[in-house]
């Protein structure tokens, strides 16, 4: 459907995970000399009509614009498990970056050229959104949240199902604690 709409579509040889897929997109953007890159999930939930608002933030000197589900009240209601995970990650990331972030797990993001260059080198491979925020913070990049209202899921299912929810929580929490330890060692 994306190709039919005129989008360039990258076919990877096999399922390498979300982090590798996103990093491949950043590598493509770097090689083509793009000034901005926009990340959207493939399930149709992210309103592409909001992309200009994210890009506008980048035009104003921000390195990352996050399409946020929580910065303002919306109709979006995550499951109880997902809501708990988001709250835990948000609390931990806020400890590290020193400012309130409402949606640390949003996959709807726009990145500046500076962020593209960083993320081609340093991008987590499993469930990368939270870790990528910390990486950007460590590299003194500025980010902002733009309120968005999600569409209902049009296709597919979440990559974080019942089977791997515990793995996801442990892996990301461990990565955040490592980031906290590294920060204190500086």
Q: Where in this protein do the model-derived segments appear?
A:
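Cys/His-dense Zn2+-coordinating finger/ribbon modules
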Residues: 42
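Glycine/small-residue-rich loop that forms an oxyanion/phosphate-binding "nest" at active or ligand-binding sites
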Residues: 45
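Acceptor/aglycone-binding surface of glycosyltransferases and processive sugar-polymer synthases
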Residues: 8, 12-31, 36, 48-126, ...
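Cell-envelope/extracellular polymer assembly enzymes that use nucleotide-activated donors
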Residues: 131
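Catalytic donor-sugar/metal-binding loop of nucleotide-sugar-dependent glycosyltransferases
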Residues: 99-100, 121-124, 134-151
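C-terminal, non-catalytic tails of nucleotide-sugar-dependent glycosyltransferases
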Residues: 171-186
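Acidic helix N-cap motif at the loop->helix transition within catalytic regions
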Residues: 1-5
